[in-house]
């Protein structure tokens, strides 16, 4: 009788379905499943690039992986992330640690990146203006056969009043951010293109689709020119392959790294 009772109880328990509260942060997880299978639940998260609901949201930040390219390296980001505390080793929780340059992946530059007096004065990523980093933005398609010179800037016909512009270039077509080897032939701003931008537009945020908004051969000079002004924010290594030309709402939120001249940044576009 005792054994029979155990069998009946087990069978009854396994047939019970329990409904849990819906967690919209994890839409891939169903809300009803068997208690008996709960411990062996084999759910897989969904990694979105585009969220298509009431509003279309584009994630224009790159994933941080060991293959992510880094400046002047053929090895990529490497093993930047490790599980320092592990439940498998008896701990109560999993805790990861990471080590990487603040200019890795999608990131912003602060004035102290190329100006030591600004670095010493505290012009860090925590001092960047969120009003500039968030708001209406124009995505433009750059001619594919050249860097962004004054001539190219003039040809784009960016109207006055536009404060945030994302430049989609040959870098996106070549998928350079998906290749771990650094490629110095990437498209970027020339010094004269940066000067034309300052003198003829109202742009305060410049977004580009590789590790530097400035072309490789003129990177120091172009960075110095733009960052010296302290009123233009470069956003680098944007992921623009899923996005069409046009107007969007941009949200860029850098980590608040006090004292740092750059910071990893989560950027999204909303249509």
UniProtKB/Swiss-Prot annotation:
Recite the UniProt keywords alphabetically. Extracellular matrix, Secreted, Signal
Query: What is the annotated signal peptide range for this record?
Result: 1-21
| Presence of keyword Secreted | yes
Q: Name one Pfam family in it.
A: Cyclase
**Record's InterPro entries?**
KFase/CYL (IPR007325), KFase_sf (IPR037175)
Q: Which residues form a coiled coil?
A: none
- Which terms does the UniProt entry file under GO BP? L-tryptophan catabolic process to kynurenine
Q: Which GO terms describe its molecular function?
A: arylformamidase activity
- Localization annotation: Secreted, Extracellular space, Extracellular matrix
Q: What cellular component terms from Gene Ontology apply here?
A: extracellular region; nucleus
Q: Which family does it belong to?
A: Belongs to the Cyclase 1 superfamily.
What is the designated name of this protein?
A: Cyclase-like protein 3
Q: Which organism is it from?
A: Arabidopsis thaliana
Which gene is transcribed and translated to give this protein?
CYCLASE3
């Amino acid at each position: 009788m005792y054994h029979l009772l155990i069998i009946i109880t087990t069978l009854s328990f396994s047939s019970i379905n329990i409904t849990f509260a819906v967690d919209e942060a994890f839409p891939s997880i169903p809300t009803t499943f068997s208690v008996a299978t709960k411990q062996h639940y084999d759910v897989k998260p969904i990694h979105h690039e585009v969220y298509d609901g009431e509003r279309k949201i584009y994630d224009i930040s790159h994933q941080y992986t060991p293959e992510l390219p880094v400046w002047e390296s053929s090895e990529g980001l490497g093993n930047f992330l490790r599980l320092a505390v592990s439940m498998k080793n008896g701990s109560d929780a999993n805790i990861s640690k990471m080590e990487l340059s603040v200019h890795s992946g999608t990131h912003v530059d602060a004035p102290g990146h190329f100006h030591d007096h600004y670095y010493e004065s505290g012009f860090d990523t925590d001092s960047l203006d969120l009003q500039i980093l968030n708001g209406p933005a124009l995505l433009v398609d750059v001619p594919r056969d050249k860097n962004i010179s004054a001539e190219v800037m003039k040809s784009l016909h960016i109207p006055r009043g536009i404060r945030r512009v994302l430049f989609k270039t040959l870098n996106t077509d070549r998928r350079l951010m998906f290749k771990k080897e650094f490629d110095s032939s990437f498209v970027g701003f020339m010094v004269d293109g940066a000067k034309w931008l300052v003198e003829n537009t109202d742009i305060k945020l410049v977004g580009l689709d590789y590790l530097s908004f400035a072309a490789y051969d003129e990177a120091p000079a172009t960075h110095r020119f733009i960052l010296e002004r302290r009123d233009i924010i470069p956003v680098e290594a944007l992921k623009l392959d899923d996005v069409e030309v046009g107007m969007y709402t941009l949200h860029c939120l850098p980590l608040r790294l006090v004292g740092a001249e750059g910071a990893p940044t989560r950027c999204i576009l909303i249509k």
